[in-house]
Amino acid sequence: MRVALLSDVYFPRVNGVSTSIETFRRELPGFGVQTLLVAPTYGGESAAPDLIRLPARPVPRDPEDRLMGYRAALALEQRLRDEAVDLIHIQTPFVAHYAGLRLARRLKLPVLATYHTLFEEYLHHYLPVAPSGALRGIARRLSRGQCNALDRVIVPSQAMAKRLASYGVTTRREILPTGIPCAQFAGGNGAGFRQRLGISPTRPVALYVGRVAFEKNISFLIEATDRARATLPDVLLLIAGEGPARAALAAQVAARGLGENVRVLDYLDRSTELPDCYAAADLFVFASRTETQGLVLLEALAAGTPVLALAEMGTAEILAPGEGTVTSPDDPIAFASLMADLLTDRAWLAALARAAPTHASRWSDQGLAGRLAHLYSDVLAGHAPRN
């Protein structure tokens, strides 16, 4: 089987969508599925036979992101025909979505999409002058129209499936999270990572990994760290990632006098640096309210690092009492109290750390890729070309 993946985002842009695409592309050939990825160019990427880079333009207010050229995407029609593509799988709801739909109609192919992101909660961060209620309504209507034009919609969590149903999406929804390569995150050199950063082996360290964006609610973690230092004066919050909220968060850190308690790192290489970073932390902390899955929580658990998080949207489906995770109320005071308790109680942390890898193994990359391959076959078997 040959599947064309269309996405407005891919590496070197680091986020959950890029990671999901890479994970499935790596594992699907083991199930008889070859992929051809169509993605924007960011400049300087090396060529690959199974990856087409299209001219792209930056997204306003978020220069890290790109939108592929619509006409350039449609010009791939003959290439996809020559490649004997069987199915089109859209990964983003922007230019890639509309180009993917058009190509599928022209080629009479089935088309499905993964709904990775809860856009109704994101738009107001990027269009702050517009009323947030109106933007949410627009996002819901757009999502409904986009999803109902597909043969199938993949969502990474039950919470996201319910949200799309509330929009009026009638297309069949399949719950299929992205898996993780658990072995890749096990056995990181945490002591070496601490030494490289000049962090004492005994200092209590909490870690956030991910995009430094407003919707990730990192300001909540900074406030919680500020409150936790009343009990643990040397507590350290590491923030590993980049994004449009860095300047605002730096201002918050300065205003609270947290220069010695919060450090912001750049993006870390997923295979060579990130496992060491997870292993260096005593606790992984996460406060996003809009995650459709929360891959970084699983990565931390696979590394044996306990997780403290809010149980919101897809994150709630990962959190399980006693399975390496602790759930906090959506309140920075309560979060800070749990954070301090965990970092102080080494026996509790150790018990959670022992349970964490087993819990993470339920999201194995191979197992979930096999489910996706089966879904592709099911969609192909039931496909009747639309007008």
Predicted features, each with a name:
Residues 289:
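Aromatic "clamp/platform" in nucleotide-sugar-dependent glycosyltransferases that forms part
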Residues 320-333, 341-346:
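Conserved acidic donor-binding segment of nucleotide-sugar-dependent glycosyltransferases
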Residues 1-56, 366, 377:
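N-terminal subdomain of nucleotide-sugar transferases
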Residues 186-199:
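A short helix/loop element that forms part of the nucleotide-sugar donor recognition site in Leloir-type
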Residues 80, 147, 267, 275-281:
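Short alpha-helical donor nucleotide-sugar binding micro-motif in glycosyltransferases
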Residues 19, 204-230, 237, 244-250, ...:
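A conserved mid-protein helix/loop that constitutes part of the nucleotide-sugar donor-binding site
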Residues 306-309:
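Short hydrophobic beta-strand element within catalytic cores of glycosyltransferases
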Residues 247-268:
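Nucleotide-activated donor-binding/catalytic signature segment of Leloir-type glycosyltransferases, i.e.
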